[in-house]
Amino acid sequence: MASLANHPTSRDQAKVMNRYDITKRMVGMLHQDEAVIGGIGYTNFDLWAASDSPHGRRQQNFYMLGSMGLAVPIALGVAIAQPFRKVFALEGDGSVLMQLGALSTVAARAQKNLCIVIMDNGAYQITGGQATATGQGADIVGIARASGLAQSAWAADEDAFVELICRSLKEDGPWLIGCRIDNQKPVDTTERDPARIRDRFMRGLGVRK
């Protein structure tokens, strides 16, 4: 396993990137077998926008509505249920902070096919931009490492983000990738139909026709 020593050691050393841009880059690297769980808020909205294509919307995405902090637990459950499938959790810093216990659970389980991507803008943007703990000194990647997730790293910039996603697709995890992002509004808004989101995702995982 290659070292992560060349990546930033703290949040302040990472470049501030655009959420939609890096989400689009990640989705573009995926095939049709990886599952992606989008947490609530603008992270979710940009995943929705980035996953549309002339061939239709990506069925292997699940868009969480209304409940904070559940992208990582849901992704862990999918990864356990389908260990042959790479599973990604996309979550904002505020939601991760709400469910910090999930990180130690992921570390204890050591699920090899799981990657967590944290979009960290230091704010609860969708509710008015109130500062999160990461905006006041907390380092979510440092917290993840202390929780037992050794393969945790800040993406220094867009190229480093692509490199880390590529490694997570090829190497065993669990992985956690921290991304400092800007406060730009999302490109689109996720559809508000929970049953349709569920059914499409289940078809994408091959558990429903």
Ranges and model annotations:
Residues S3-M68:
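Active-site diphosphate/adenylate-binding microenvironment
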Residues I40-T43, N121-A123, R180-P186:
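Glycine-rich beta-alpha junction loops
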